[in-house]
Regions:
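Short coil/turn segments at alpha/beta junctions that flank glycine-rich nucleotide-binding fingerprints
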Residues: 74, 90, 106-110
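C-terminal "cap" of GNAT-fold acetyltransferases
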Residues: 2-6, 14, 110-113, 117-130, ...
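Acetyl-CoA-dependent GNAT
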Residues: 2-79, 84-86, 97-99, 103, ...
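Active-site acidic-Proline motif in GNAT/NAT acetyltransferases
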Residues: 84-86, 90, 118
Length: 156
């Protein structure tokens, strides 16, 4: 699939394309790291006003997604970051994460956090390249800190 015309757009969390991508992400995570480590938000949770979802498309085909959930304390979390296998390593993940960071900056958030797993070293490299550093478990993950957590401070 040629990747010269990548488009990223805001998406309705209940759109069929986003549902398909999130389903593919869940299937991938369950296979790679097990159901017990997949803390992904369900579609209904992503459809709230505090969450923006982005879809990456190539020639109209949905090939990736990522979201930003904004919390009342002025922090945010990267949600449901995924790129289909066939177009990984093409920069789509980087572009999606840039969109999420830009949305967090526009919302004047102080810090942006995310959860990942040791089973996704490529994702970890991307997060580090975008200025994220390891941090302790936070929010809903404190009681079950079995994955890896990263943050990027957006204000000084």
């Amino acid at each position: 699939m040629p990747v010269d015309r990548i488009e990223i757009e805001l998406a309705d969390a209940r759109s069929p394309d986003l549902i398909n991508l999130v389903t593919a992400l869940d299937n991938f995570l369950n296979k790679v790291c097990g159901v017990e480590r997949n803390h992904g938000s369900p579609i209904d949770r992503l459809a709230h006003d505090d969450t923006q979802m982005f879809i990456a498309r190539i020639a109209g085909q949905a090939v990736g997604c990522a979201g930003l959930q904004v919390f009342a304390d002025g922090t945010g979390e990267v949600k449901r970051m995924y790129v289909v296998t066939e177009v990984r390593t093409t920069g789509i993940g980087s572009r999606l994460l840039t969109c999420v960071v830009e949305a967090a900056l526009a919302a004047k958030l102080s810090v942006l956090r995310l959860e990942t797993t040791e089973f996704l070293p490529d994702a970890q490299r991307l997060y580090r390249a975008k200025g994220f550093v390891p941090c302790p478990a936070y929010g809903p993950y404190v009681s079950n800190p079995i994955n890896l957590y990263f943050e990027r401070w957006l204000t000084k």
